[in-house]
């Protein structure tokens, strides 16, 4: 959407510069041309990037994505290196959700302040747009995604977890076919196949290199991907139907998810053991957890800005490059075994991601392939047969 908006602004400006006649005396035309030349608004929290050129917007968004998500991955892995913390991945999720509630509330007040022009602390956030029953479903899916993803680090290497996250297309493709009845082209299926092959190879290499490899971690991160795939479909439908801002979706999803998880941990008794452990290591848990949550929350804002300014395919390419850099940093900063199979299987996954991005710009269908095969067969049938005469 952002790519289309940026393109329309460039085309309008170009046509206006090439045609001088219509901009003469008509106030209507003058008003239209001045309003059409306004670029689409691009904000990251309270920072306005609207009046920067598209290249500057892209570079700032890329820098934010790389810096914040590399910091996010580093802090996440660092927290799990604390001795004895691995069983408390769900408590880390509870802490993260609590911080996200505070960040979301501040962002909603900032949005209301910008629109109402009143004091920041006297302004009230906009009323809720999406029905509560939808948020109850979104909160459960968000809890499954974040909780299972965090907890899987107790059983998997961080690079393996990131590789699994790169393969989100697989459950998204299957879920949208079964739930929404969408149709996909051959490039999408080729991308999913590459991801499956690379993922299986990477997991096999990890099971051979890591002595504490546990299939429970694979099950957890797979469950997180399934929840993440369902979130995309539910969020997209709800935001289109009710015109809800992203800050509202984040606030209610994580707020209700916090309530879910808090009740579950109270009933199971895991809350008190996790809280006691974190009180013994406040800096490594609550302190690093704050920076971990803040970098993740701000990273979401930069990704959304990148989508608006450069389009979803470019954003997907940037986030994929970010994940590759994160994996490299993980091997450099944290000691872990390495094998060349990690590299080759990772490249196969990257190929799948590239095919997925390429398919967004080139809508190749199975009908196109069949028609091309028919044309090729027709040309072969019409080509004159060559006779080779051998004279003796």
From Swiss-Prot:
Its main location: Golgi. It is found in: Golgi apparatus membrane. Pfam families: UAA. It comes from Drosophila pseudoobscura pseudoobscura (Fruit fly). Residues 11-35 are annotated as: Disordered. GO terms for molecular function: 3'-phosphoadenosine 5'-phosphosulfate transmembrane transporter activity. It is a multi-pass membrane protein. The chain crosses the membrane at residues 62-82, 87-107, 136-156, 159-179, 185-205, 212-232, 249-269, 286-306, 314-334, 338-358. GO terms for biological process: 3'-phosphoadenosine 5'-phosphosulfate transport. Belongs to the nucleotide-sugar transporter family. SLC35B subfamily. This is Adenosine 3'-phospho 5'-phosphosulfate transporter 2. Keywords: Developmental protein, Golgi apparatus, Membrane, Transmembrane, Transmembrane helix, Transport. It comes from the Eukaryota. Mediates the transport of adenosine 3'-phospho 5'-phosphosulfate (PAPS), from cytosol into Golgi. PAPS is a universal sulfuryl donor for sulfation events that take place in the Golgi. Essential for viability. Involved in glycosaminoglycan synthesis and the subsequent signaling. May be involved in hh and dpp signaling by controlling the sulfation of heparan sulfate (HS). GO terms for cellular component: endoplasmic reticulum membrane; Golgi apparatus; Golgi membrane. InterPro entries: SCL35B1-4/HUT1 (IPR013657).
């Amino acid at each position: 959407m952002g790519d289309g908006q940026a393109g329309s602004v460039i085309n309008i400006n170009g046509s206006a510069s090439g045609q001088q006649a219509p901009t003469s005396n008509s106030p209507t035309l003058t008003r239209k041309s001045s309003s059409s030349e306004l670029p689409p608004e691009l904000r990251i929290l309270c920072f306005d990037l609207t009046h920067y050129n598209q290249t500057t917007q892209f570079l700032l968004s890329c820098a934010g994505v790389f810096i914040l998500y590399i910091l996010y991955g580093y802090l996440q892995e660092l927290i799990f290196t604390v001795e004895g913390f691995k069983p408390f991945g769900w408590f880390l999720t509870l802490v993260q959700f609590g911080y996200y509630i505070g960040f979301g509330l501040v962002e909603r007040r900032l949005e209301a302040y910008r629109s109402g022009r009143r004091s920041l602390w006297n302004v009230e956030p906009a009323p809720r747009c999406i029905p509560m029953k939808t948020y109850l479903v979104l909160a459960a899916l968000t809890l499954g995604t974040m909780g299972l993803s965090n907890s899987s680090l107790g059983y998997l290497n961080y690079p393996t977890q990131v590789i699994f996250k790169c393969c989100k297309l697989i459950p998204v493709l299957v879920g949208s076919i079964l739930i929404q009845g969408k149709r996909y082209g051959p490039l999408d299926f080729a991308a999913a196949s590459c991801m499956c092959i690379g993922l299986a190879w990477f997991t096999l290499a990890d099971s051979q290199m890591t002595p504490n490899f546990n299939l429970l971690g694979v099950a957890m991160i797979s469950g997180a991907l399934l929840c993440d795939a369902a979130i995309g479909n539910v969020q997209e439908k709800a935001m289109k139907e009710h015109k809800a801002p992203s800050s509202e979706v984040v606030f209610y999803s994580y707020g209700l998810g916090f309530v879910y998880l808090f009740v579950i941990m109270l009933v199971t008794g895991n809350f008190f053991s996790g809280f006691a452990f974190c009180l013994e290591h406040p800096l490594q848990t609550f302190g690093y957890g704050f920076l971990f949550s803040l970098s993740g929350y701000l990273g979401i804002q930069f990704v959304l800005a990148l989508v608006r300014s450069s389009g979803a395919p470019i954003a997907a390419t940037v986030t994929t490059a970010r994940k590759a850099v994160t994996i490299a940093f993980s091997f450099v900063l944290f000691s872990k075994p390495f094998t060349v199979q990690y590299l080759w299987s990772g490249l196969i996954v990257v190929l799948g991601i590239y095919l997925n991005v390429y398919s967004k710009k080139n809508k190749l269908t199975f009908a196109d392939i069949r028609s091309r095969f028919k044309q090729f067969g027709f040309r072969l049938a019409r080509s004159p047969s060559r006779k080779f005469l051998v004279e003796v």
